[in-house]
Amino acid sequence: MTGLERQLTEMLEAPVVAAGYELVGLEFVRAGQHSTLRIFIDHENGITVEDCAEVSRQVSAVLDVEDPISVVYNLEVSSPGLERPLFKAAHYEQFIGHEVSIVLKMAVGNRRKWKGVIQSIDGETVAVMVDGQEEHFALSNISKANLIPKF
């Protein structure tokens, strides 16, 4: 998580929770002149388009006042979806036994991309079973992690 993403998470968590939703996480993606702020929300009853629109209005109001982003960007609010991103230790705990795809910031064993089943989370380290071998990754070294849906 970048410094800006951390700042945005701290700024936006309270309004999202006040609206009755969980802020699963967010991503700020810079792509030339087309940057995007993606906010993932969840609710015990699921997420509708109306829920996303409501949170978008709430978040937009905060962003307009605080103005933390210095470039032009698009705001996207959505559910985490089938390939749910994992941002926090609690997310890994919640999905123990599920298959995950992980991209590391710094390679471990000459690899940055890993797929396996979440075994456990201990503080800031997640254990993942990869091809019959348990691998351990520091959450601070995980650039991106997503559940792999089963059909």
Swiss-Prot record:
Q: Which UniProt keywords apply?
A: Cytoplasm, Ribosome biogenesis
Q: What is its main location?
A: cytoplasm
The answer to keyword Protein transport applying to this record is no
Where does the record say this protein resides? Cytoplasm
- Report if keyword NADP is assigned: no
Question: Family per UniProt?
Answer: Belongs to the RimP family.
Q: Which PANTHER family match?
A: RIBOSOME MATURATION FACTOR RIMP
Per the entry, what this protein does is:
Required for maturation of 30S ribosomal subunits.
Listed name of the protein: Ribosome maturation factor RimP
The protein's gene is named: rimP
